[in-house]
Swiss-Prot record:
Protein name, entry field: 4-hydroxy-tetrahydrodipicolinate synthase
Pathway(s) annotated for this protein in UniProt: Amino-acid biosynthesis; L-lysine biosynthesis via DAP pathway; (S)-tetrahydrodipicolinate from L-aspartate: step 3/4
PROSITE patterns, alphabetized: DHDPS_1, DHDPS_2
Organism field: Synechococcus elongatus (strain ATCC 33912 / PCC 7942 / FACHB-805) (Anacystis nidulans R2)
Record-annotated active site: Y139 (proton donor/acceptor), K167 (schiff-base intermediate with substrate)
UniProt KW Lyase keyword: yes
Reaction(s) catalysed (UniProt annotation): L-aspartate 4-semialdehyde + pyruvate = (2S,4S)-4-hydroxy-2,3,4,5-tetrahydrodipicolinate + H2O + H(+)
Pfam families according to UniProt: DHDPS
EC nos: 4.3.3.7
Single biological process term from Gene Ontology: lysine biosynthetic process via diaminopimelate
Length: 299
């Protein structure tokens, strides 16, 4: 189906598989990427928060971009997580990613150094102008970065031709309302929280950058398409059906729970890298219960 938005409706923020020695398992990453596309993902974010970008080297990230693009080709948008709190590093990483034929780049709000809004504007503008041929998705996640990208700043950035979307992960539906009022219809807003996908659709979002789509991609596609078709009751039904899983996937720091869930479903994706640790037995049991209820898992 042709996608009306720059990266589709359902974009999976993909986990990074590791082998028993803790090295990136590129072959499993390729298999997982193909599986996710077959299960309804229109796009894949590689080396984002869920992909454990803080503990990957640049060489590992670049090889992951290559491997995933090789695996999925043109069947899905491949979006490189090349953001940084150092503008020069973000530009260099994004320029390198642009040479690989990827479809876009995810640019997180600079973390820890907490620039003011004018600094955020200058940061993203510098990246956009240095990489004019690569579409950029802004990424607002103040719970991790310590700073929020304000709607007015996003509106200024939207005037740049290759700044085409935002992942809104503040947990604030009012932010999406403000964004939609300020931005052109061509600028895509993606929910950054699975549990807020339906509420954000109601105020003007187009889709979701999802963790849960590792497990329930077809259902998320059905939810969004039902809403688009005006079948709000069906969208609500799917939302409530999936809601326990949405919450279970954030019982502790992402991506710990989704990695455990994928292991329960038979994926050999290894342990997260320190300082992240494996899911507790209690969290694994909660995930198993949710997956069983959805008909996805049998103990």
């Amino acid at each position: 189906m042709p996608q009306p938005y720059p990266f589709g409706r359902v974009i999976t923020a993909m986990i990074t598989p590791f082998n028993a020695e803790g090295q990136v398992a590129y072959d499993i990453a390729q298999s997982l990427a193909v599986h996710l596309v077959e299960q309804g993902s229109d796009g894949l974010v590689i080396c984002g928060t869920t992909g454990e970008s803080p503990t990957l080297t640049w060489e590992e990230e670049l090889q992951l971009f290559r491997a995933v693009k090789e695996a999925v080709g043109d069947r899905a948008a491949v979006i490189a997580g090349t953001g940084s709190n150092c503008t020069r590093e973000a530009i260099a990483a994004t320029q390198s990613a642009a040479t690989l034929g990827l479809n876009g780049s995810l640019q997180v709000v600079p973390y820890y150094n907490k620039p003011p809004q004018e600094g955020l504007y200058a940061h993203f503008r510098a990246i956009a102008e240095a990489c004019p041929d690569l579409p950029l998705m802004l990424y607002n996640i103040p719970g991790r970065t310590g700073q929020s990208l304000q709607p007015e700043t996003v509106a200024r950035l939207a005037s740049l031709p290759n700044v085409v979307a935002i992942k809104a992960a503040s947990g604030n539906v009012e932010e999406v309302s403000a964004l939609r009022q300020l931005l052109p219809d061509s600028f895509a807003i993606y929910s950054g929280d699975d549990s807020l996908t339906l509420p954000m659709l109601a105020v003007g979002a187009q889709g979701v950058v999802s963790v849960a789509s590792h497990l329930v991609g077809p259902q998320l596609q059905a939810l969004i398409q039902a809403f688009e078709a005006g079948n709000v009751a069906r969208a609500q039904q799917l939302h409530h059906q999936l809601y326990p899983l949405f919450k279970a996937l954030f019982l502790t720091t992402n991506p710990i729970p989704v990695r455990a869930a994928m292991e329960l479903l038979g994926w050999s994706i290894g342990l997260p890298r320190l300082p992240l640790v494996p899911a507790s037995a209690e969290i694994r049991q909660a995930l198993a219960s949710c997956l069983t209820e959805l008909g996805l898992y049998t103990a």
